[in-house]
């Protein structure tokens, strides 16, 4: 009996091991690192899940590319100015705010699998309905409703990578998110080319069909692949024979109680914990500005090429937009694959320094874009802008999510998105259009320059974050060393 309580059951532990293709336990060093997470799965399964989760970002962003590429046709059809057209982007921002609030509420009530599949299928159905809107006000309203169901998958993507991603490649996996998002916008641009200028709304039917398809695929997977809490309960049940009845009951109660903490008091407690965490608060502020400006530039870049750079051939616009959407973020992933070994991952101190330097390069490129009228120079600088942007967002996302305990990561990320879309990416397209309408007679790149001045505000924000973060990390390291010294001293006395 004593042996059962103190020694691991070899038969049960073998069942928990990951098996390779030959059915033998795979105990490589990297695999052991991966298995420190909440789920023990083979890398093959992790990669499949990663592709499915990230593909939701690919198809959700099609609508942004569709609207951007169809700006002239939409403005002509509904007789709109830049300010009015910007309302389509702003309504999306308002919808995202509502989507964040709903996600925060339902996160602890429903499983991640249910939230993901329902959001994707509903968004797909609404995107198809978008095709039949002939009134601009209805178009703006439906655009906002569609954006509500966009947020849960978008929030969960980063959370899933942080919790279940392959340990060695987490920074790179985080960097693929902006790449896939811009790739999705480019795909929306491609829909526009396929269906034609006058039939731009048909592109939403294509997008909606893909969204429903991905949502149905997710329903086919076990829900334990999307929820660490469910897996934790199963692990406790599997190990029931190796612990006492009291321990089993306590662990199960704690896990289930944590899952049901959806009361208003608990929510405000979580929010207070997040806001009082300086690393989370400051990185969230910087991320909000950065993401808001990037979203606005993506919304307007096609219109900018047509009306400021004066590229009239829509196929040429598509080629340049595609290059920006694919090569820029892809370069960011490559950049982070080089930077990641040097900084040791986004949990380390060097990550903050890397974010500052990369963002300074991003601001320089962005400021220069507003003064250029040559399409080759514009293409090169825009590519560099999105390359640096993708790198910075990957690092900042990692710093933000990893700065809080696992139980409130999803809540923290959803609140960060709430702030981003309510204060930055929501008003961004409208602000760009407003500035452009007012000052474009004096300076054609007025809207772009305004956005880049706001983007530059992130430099002092990231510097402050770095100073505070370094102090906190130094304090934790010192406490860790003191514990080791005390432990050695106690062992020496014994």
Regions flagged by a language model, labelled:
Residues 2-62:
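Cytosolic juxtamembrane N-terminal segment immediately preceding the first transmembrane helix
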Residues 48-82, 297-302:
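Extracytoplasmic
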Residues 65, 92-101, 151, 185-186, ...:
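Residue-level signature of mid-helix packing/kink "hotspots" within the transmembrane helices
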Residues 67-68, 277-336, 393, 397, ...:
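Extracytoplasmic gate region of multi-pass secondary transporters
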Residues 98-136:
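Conserved MFS/SLC helix-loop-helix module at the cytosolic interface between two early adjacent transmembrane helices
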Residues 114-128, 350-367:
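Structural signature of the two symmetry-related core transmembrane helices
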Residues 142-180:
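Cytoplasmic helix-loop-helix junction between adjacent transmembrane helices
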Residues 177-228:
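Helix-loop-helix hairpin linking two adjacent transmembrane segments in secondary transporters
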